[in-house]
């Protein structure tokens, strides 16, 4: 990627927010090398981000690894075979009218290159539905040495060449998920590692034509209250945007996938949708620049109904960003159970998927009501130490 280098004398912050409480020396003028992105894809990135962040639509996250997909299939008594994964993914992407509610679909690498059971490329099916294909590009979590039993996300090695190939295959956005655990700290090291990795990924993605979805998931695990989640989330997003700026990421060409600000899953004090909305919107206003086109929330183990109610509460007034959803289990859970691996249940399962997609579409517009929701849709899906 071509870039231009300018020499400029200026005062620059030398520390991110984590170091803000330390005694700072008086700033001195320094001569620094400023790198200006010469982005060949900039206009396309902005257009793609705006397409995904369109009114009444959100993202279907169907990028579970083959191992995680195997767990989902096992829950309905199916073996984890490529044929079964193909059958389930075919069910999802061929749901009639899905594009009315879904603007983007995050795929696992196998899915990006996969065809439906009828032999048509899944990417082509999505495009016909006016759904932008995306791709999970991280390589999963591994232990972070020197931390309090925390993790970091791998996958930067070879990312540029992989993303160039994904672009040629039809992907137009990418997703990188890292996690922060409140019961384990989080340590300064873990937060910095998460933020830096996300920033490098975002810069590399934009250089290769893919809109990066930035996802530092704050896990639900723990007994902490909502105020503690809010405190940690402020630090995580401050670090993330600090390092994205350092890496010359164009904010108009990214999307965010944050956790909602909620109490820990094991906290005795539960939060109402209005409380979740108040805390989450306060976080966004404090930390997220209005240049960012879309905030696509993850559900993180909330029940299908809870995730929809919380999103609806956040859309009761105007926001400077498109506030929407990027759900996996909160869109698919009832659909998967309805299907049960039986061909005769495909239509009923697709209807269940469309029902949830429509509910969240209405929530994005602030028009959702929970009247008539099934009891099963209200069951929480939190799994302690969940591995995606």
UniProtKB/Swiss-Prot annotation:
Substrate binds at residues 72, 299-301, 329. Keywords: Chloroplast, Glycolysis, Lyase, Plastid, Schiff base, Transit peptide. One of its GO terms (biological process) is gluconeogenesis. It catalyses: beta-D-fructose 1,6-bisphosphate = D-glyceraldehyde 3-phosphate + dihydroxyacetone phosphate. Residues 1-38 form a transit peptide. The record marks 388 as: Necessary for preference for fructose 1,6-bisphosphate over fructose 1-phosphate. GO terms for cellular component: cytoplasm; cytosol; plastoglobule. Pathway: Carbohydrate degradation; glycolysis; D-glyceraldehyde 3-phosphate and glycerone phosphate from D-glucose: step 4/4. Its EC number is 4.1.2.13. It is an enzyme of class 4 (lyase). Induction: By exposure to light. This is Fructose-bisphosphate aldolase, chloroplastic. The gene is ALDP.
